[in-house]
């Protein structure tokens, strides 16, 4: 979690498809090939623990994956760029005193001083300027070199939501709201949008002066923060719960329960992730065998890695709560659909980084 009693929970698509009907909170190509020289003499045909042979990021990790992971962040001074085109500085933008605007064909470079050699993540806070409604794409270079395939295809999502309330026609069928962009400040790590790697990309930097370059592939964006970030290892559940102060986070209301319907999501990463309906099961809420009642979200449209749906929930006090998700994956027989759970933008522990939904025609409740 980058430093910066309402809790926002986001589920991110990783592999195929799942449907979410209820969210219950309980207590308790611009193809670039300048990375080829980096692997001159290296056997790129060797398999890497089952990873695709043409994935140069796998080879990159073979070369640098055992390097140190320094603990300090390196903040990039956005306005001290050394080279730029399609860039402008804006003041008083969406609550920020000063920001950097990138056009859809922009390119900007900064010189950064890295205190310690090792592996780092790249973290960004951006505002998705309204344009054509597609994901924002960027390429990232270190010292003029694309480190690996995938660093030239970084995707940053937009934010969508409902324009209006659910309406009914004269037959009692519910009409889903129109989807509109609801841009807001977003935070993200540079990562593989295809989902082959669920963790953020790890970039290797030598200590001393380095030049980093951020290049637009499509769509404009506004940036308020860019960080060469220390890699925080995600704890397992045992480590996570052991670190919780049980005296501070002690629930007084042990009977608390809150149900949030899946179709009542607040924000989404794509306009196709709207509320829809299922009339095949009486376990859905609301249910009608004859009329259209919006009682789920996702479905066949929720199949692209990195797509997310967000719900806002409010809990009465700091404490430990259980989260249950009612979902169904009945589209791909023999496949497992995985989802990650984020609380306030953070995956709390490893076990919720890939929650599996196996093929089944029945809805299942996972806690």
Where are these regions (language model features)?
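Extracytoplasmic
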Residues: 4-367
């Amino acid at each position: 979690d980058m430093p910066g009693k309402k809790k926002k929970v986001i589920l991110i698509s990783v592999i195929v498809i799942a449907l979410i009907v209820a969210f219950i909170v309980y207590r308790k190509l611009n193809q670039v090939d300048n990375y080829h020289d980096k692997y001159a003499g290296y056997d790129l045909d060797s398999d890497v623990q089952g990873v695709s042979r043409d994935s140069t990021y796998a080879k990159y990790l073979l070369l640098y994956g055992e390097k140190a992971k320094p603990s300090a962040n390196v903040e990039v001074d956005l306005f001290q760029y050394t080279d730029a085109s399609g860039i402008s500085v804006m003041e008083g933008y969406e609550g920020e005193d000063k920001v950097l605007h990138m056009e859809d064909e922009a390119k900007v470079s900064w010189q950064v001083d890295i205190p310690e050699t090792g592996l780092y993540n790249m973290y960004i806070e951006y505002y998705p300027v309204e344009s054509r409604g597609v994901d924002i794409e960027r390429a990232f270079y270190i010292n003029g070199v694309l480190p690996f395939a995938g660093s030239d295809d970084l995707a940053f999502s937009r934010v969508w939501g409902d324009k209006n309330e659910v309406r009914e026609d004269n037959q009692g069928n519910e009409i889903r709201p129109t989807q509109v962009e609801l841009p807001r400040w977003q935070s993200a790590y540079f990562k593989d949008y295809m989902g082959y790697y669920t963790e953020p990309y790890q970039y290797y930097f030598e200590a001393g002066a380095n030049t980093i370059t951020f290049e637009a592939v499509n769509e404009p964006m506004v940036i308020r923060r860019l960080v060469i970030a220390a890699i925080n290892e995600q704890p397992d559940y045992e480590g996570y719960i052991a670190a919780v102060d049980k005296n501070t986070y002690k629930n007084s209301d042990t009977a608390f329960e809150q149900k949030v319907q899946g179709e009542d999501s607040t924000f989404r990463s794509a306009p196709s992730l709207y509320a829809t309906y299922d009339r095949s099961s009486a376990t859905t809420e609301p249910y009608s065998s004859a009329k259209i009642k919006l009682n789920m979200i996702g479905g066949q449209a929720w199949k692209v890695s990195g797509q997310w749906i967000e719900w806002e929930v409010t809990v009465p006090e700091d404490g430990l709560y259980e989260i249950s998700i009612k979902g169904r994956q009945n589209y791909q027989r023999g496949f497992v659909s995985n989802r990650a759970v984020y609380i306030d933008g953070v995956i709390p522990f490893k076990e919720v980084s890939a929650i599996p939904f196996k093929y089944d025609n029945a809805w299942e409740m996972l806690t």
